Amino acid sequence: MKPSRMIAFPIEAARVLSSDKNFRNNAILGSSKLNRMGLHRWRVAQSHAASARRRAALAPSLRPEEVHQFEANGFVVRQNALPTDLFRRVVDELETIPRQAWEMRQGHAITRLMPLPGHDDGSAAAAVRRWLIEPEIRALVGYVSGRAGGYNPVVQTIANRPDPTNPDPQNTLHADTYHPTAKFWLFLHDVGPDEGPFSYVAGSHRLTPERLDWEYEQSLLASDAKNAHHASGSFRVSEADLGVFGYGELVTLPVPANTLVVADTFGFHRRTPTDKPTVRTEIHAMLRRNPFLPWNGVDVSEIPFIHDRALEWRFQYRDWKTRRGKPDKYRNVGLRFAADPAD
């Protein structure tokens, strides 16, 4: 064994019991031999079993109707989520006060991120962040994720300029990873059927025998997949193949402003394709933690000093990489209004 492999092997082996999903960057996770013996199948089955136990502990603190909605569909939709006054304040603030922003291009879509304040500076944005990490919302996001924990909401703008020669990878149905995980969007404006709304295959958060078999089959070839997202563990699936899983229909979710959508993105989902140029703004966050740990919460990222500054540090690190000649996928674009068109 080469010295470099001797160093990498124990690190890659330890990551079997982690949220690591990348078949191409981890020789153990990507080993067709080990996956033929059942490694990926085991990771999927065990992570879902552990998530079910953690969800059972969180369920009593949730609204019963939202538990039912999630179990049936894999997502929760809550309209009129923010208090009306706070909603109006944050929309007005984002329209009139520019914030530091970072942008990423994927295909013909631009994603702009603006971190919310990690401390109370008197702004509506800081108040929204506090609301989104209150115990009730935290429990809901943790339940959907299969493990409660800390998360850091950001203002996210999606600017879509349709271009058939440069497709948006988020328009393809996919699962984010192999275990339950949560993303949420608090939409600040109406999102119509032709404005790229969120779509989800109803019930696809459930690990059916057919889905487990499919995960196994994908794992055998994933490390050599031409699609980089597929090789990284975010498996793509065609609409034509959905019938084999025993799930429900592909549901599109146009929503009115001030709607919160929380989804388990182990389920198949996408940004609905549109040929209409659009710009939409939302508050977005994700919660993805080690799926093998038996408890909810109790994570280093939740230490107040760390939690309140994590996003600030992350974006500072991205800027530092860029200055060192290693540009990050997100580039600093200076001060922007949330709804500014992309450069």
Labelled PLM ranges:
Residues P153, N166-Q170, K183, D194-Y200, ...:
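A short secondary-structure junction signal
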Residues Q170-T177, F268-R271:
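Histidine-centered catalytic micro-motifs
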Residues L86-R88, D194, T208-P209, R270-T272, ...:
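Short catalytic/ligand-binding loop motif for oxyanion handling, primarily in non-cytosolic enzymes
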Residues Q156-T165, Y178, H189-P193, S204-L207:
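Short acidic/polar capping segments at secondary-structure boundaries
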Residues E195-G267:
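Double-stranded beta-helix
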Residues K2-R24, W42-H48, A52-R55, W214-E217, ...:
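Non-heme Fe(II)/2-oxoglutarate
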Residues K2-A72, Q79-N171:
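Non-heme Fe(II)-dependent double-stranded beta-helix
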Residues T177-P193, P254-V255, V262, M286-R289:
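Short, conserved beta-strand element in jelly-roll/cupin
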